[in-house]
Amino acid sequence: PYFGGYSSMNALTYFISTHKDWQELLARPPYNLQIKCDGNYALLKYNMIESNFDLPEVCEARGCIYKRDGDDWFLINYPFSKFWNYGESRAANIKWENAVVTEKIDGSMVTLWWDEGWHWSTSGTIDAFAAPVNGTDKTFGNLIDEAINYRYGSVENFLKIADADGSKGKSTHIFE
């Protein structure tokens, strides 16, 4: 089956495809997902306190976005699943003899994805230009534009690079 730009079905997509009342079910315990809708899009994000991270559907809900087409929903933006930091009980078992550690800096995750045009999202908002930055009059979309203009000269120059890799509609670009 084809699920947006992804060739296999994850647990969350399977749940959505097999439950017509998925929004109501996933918003309640044990999932407690935050579901934000904007037009034909729905963004799903776990709740750090109330969601049950033993469930794969919860771990996959890290700002993924689905698009409605009639009665069906297709995954079109999948940043990556929940992961845990070193020392946390659910952290991956790392083979340190083969690992290379550089640096991990926490930030705000934003994604660039294609659906009849390029879209910027945060992990909690479908449209980054509707996501306010605390303490400022700017949005995350404004900050993205400023950073791109500084580094690439213009958003158009940056999008030429994003278009050149052939990923349009097939992958999610992630920035933090």
Show which residues each predicted segment covers:
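Core nucleotide-handling region used for phosphoryl-transfer chemistry
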Residues: 3-176
